Amino acid sequence: MPTRLPTLTDFPTSLHLTITPPPPSSPQLTNILILLHGLGDTSASFTNLGKQLSLPETTCISMQAPTPLPFELGGFHWGDDIQFDQATGNMDFDTGFSKAIKILKQEVIEDCLVGKCGYKHREIMFFGFGQGAMAAIAAAASMNEELGGIISIGGLLPASDTSAKAAKTPLLVLGGSSNTLITKTAITNLEASFQNVEYHRWSKAGDGMPQNREEMLPIMRFFARRLKSRKGVPGGSVEIG
């Protein structure tokens, strides 16, 4: 069992993050959910998400990507570099994740959550959107330990991933029915790097965040399976059908 909740002073001062403790009705310290925003966003939106989820026995940590976007574009990014697609003019999601891996794997998980607070790897989960999901996938793929899981909305396996063996961490991937990055090739690549990949295809177009109960249902089912509980899930806290 973890010895205590993490505090802001446990983390390097270079990291910008917020910590949302478990609901008062669930005082046990059991799980950590690390929330990673998408390209060009900040941690604020996922801080609100953590509060809205209100998962029992779960502390939510919303992290801000380490590097601001250039040219007064606003927001932050998880990549090692900034590149633009010459055909579309859009920013490339996949520009290397060595910096993000170091932050997530070493500074956050190993040094703070495991080393200082006594959490087990199995008690730590990721929820990532877009480029944030790719950062989570890259970090988990580089680890020998099994984490609680990754929920990836529109996140791919980074091209830079060179893992020699499939990671143990279970992965839930969600994407739209059209205009999506989650193609058959993307799933095949993920299945080559992770032992357990579950794919849910939404009926809507695009890889946006879930907007209703139907779109949230596979996520809540994944939480129900993978979040640890020392006294059971309180009625109504996690809707599974």
PLM feature segments, named:
Residues 2-121:
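Serine-hydrolase catalytic machinery in alpha/beta-hydrolase-like enzymes
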Residues 37-39, 124-129, 176:
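Conserved alpha/beta-hydrolase "nucleophile elbow" surrounding the catalytic nucleophile
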Residues 44, 180-186:
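Conserved alpha/beta-hydrolase "acid-adjacent" motif
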Residues 64-68, 156, 205:
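Short beta-to-alpha linker loops that shape the active-site pocket of alpha/beta-hydrolase fold enzymes
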Residues 122-167:
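Primarily recognizes the serine-hydrolase "nucleophile elbow" in alpha/beta-hydrolase
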Residues 159, 176-182, 207-209:
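Acidic catalytic loop of the alpha/beta-hydrolase fold
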Residues 167, 171-175, 179:
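Short beta-strand/loop motif that positions the catalytic acidic residue
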Residues 184-241:
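C-terminal catalytic histidine-bearing segment of alpha/beta-hydrolase fold enzymes
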